[in-house]
Amino acid sequence: LVGAISMMLDGNHRRAELGYWIGRPFWGRGYATEAARAMLDFGFGSMGLNRIFAHHMRDNPASGRVLANIGMTREGVLSQHVLKWDQFRDVVLYGLTRERFLASKETVHPGQR
């Protein structure tokens, strides 16, 4: 197993939370970025979502780079939001709206939607 990726849907608000993990032997190969981009395409395209967001542990900057690389914007920090290994940890929140996603696609591929 290389890893997993999912979106937890909130249909009432047309949004989803993106989550993923990649097994250590596969870190640094671009798998998370590639899979996350595919999820954005699916979420904003086929599913008609308006917003997709994600968070990562503050002490995992590699995951933050994945979120930035797929076009998400850092929106803030939730202090001591998660209890992991008997310690409360901060998480960094990222998000992307449909409008910004489509605008970025238009910049990269003018005239194609």
Give names to the regions the model predicted:
Residues 1-113:
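Acyl-donor (CoA/ACP) binding surface of acyl/acetyltransferases
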